[in-house]
């Protein structure tokens, strides 16, 4: 399954609760190995950093596991477990531009 993060809103700083990546977007989806996350955004203003849980919680992007900046990033989910993504532009993560998912094996 291909999932566009934020659906039609895409990957952006949430304004007035228009997007809630964890509670409204990710919480009602089941992610499996083989699925694809698509981050759509204006690369002049945003990016995507895969980070650890600790860095997700503190919005620290100084040591990302991986970085993406095409504006149309396709991330293949290849391993099980918790995955954490933030926007590395200053203050964007603090304002809610972050998402975490749990990848499981398809039964």
Curated annotation (Swiss-Prot):
The keyword Metal-binding applies. Pfam families: Cu_bind_like (PF02298). Residues 1-105 form the Phytocyanin domain. GO terms for cellular component: plasma membrane. Cu cation binds at residues 46, 87, 92, 97. CDD domains: Mavicyanin. InterPro entries: BlueCu_1_BS, Cupredoxin, Mavicyanin, Phytocyanin-like, Phytocyanin_dom. Glycans are attached at residues 28, 60, 102. Disulfide bonds join 59-93. SUPFAM superfamilies: Cupredoxins. Keywords: Copper, Disulfide bond, Electron transport, Glycoprotein, Metal-binding, Transport. This is Stellacyanin. It comes from Toxicodendron vernicifluum.
């Amino acid at each position: 399954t291909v999932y566009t993060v934020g659906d039609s809103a895409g990957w952006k700083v949430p304004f007035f609760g228009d997007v809630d990546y964890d509670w409204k977007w990710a919480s009602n989806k089941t992610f499996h190995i083989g699925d694809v996350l698509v981050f759509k955004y204006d690369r002049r203003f945003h990016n995507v950093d895969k980070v650890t849980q600790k860095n997700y919680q503190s919005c620290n992007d100084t040591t990302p596991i991986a970085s993406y900046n095409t504006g149309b990033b396709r991330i293949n989910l290849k391993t099980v477990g918790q995955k954490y993504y933030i926007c590395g532009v200053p203050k964007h993560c603090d304002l809610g531009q972050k998402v975490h998912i749990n990848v499981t094996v398809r039964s």
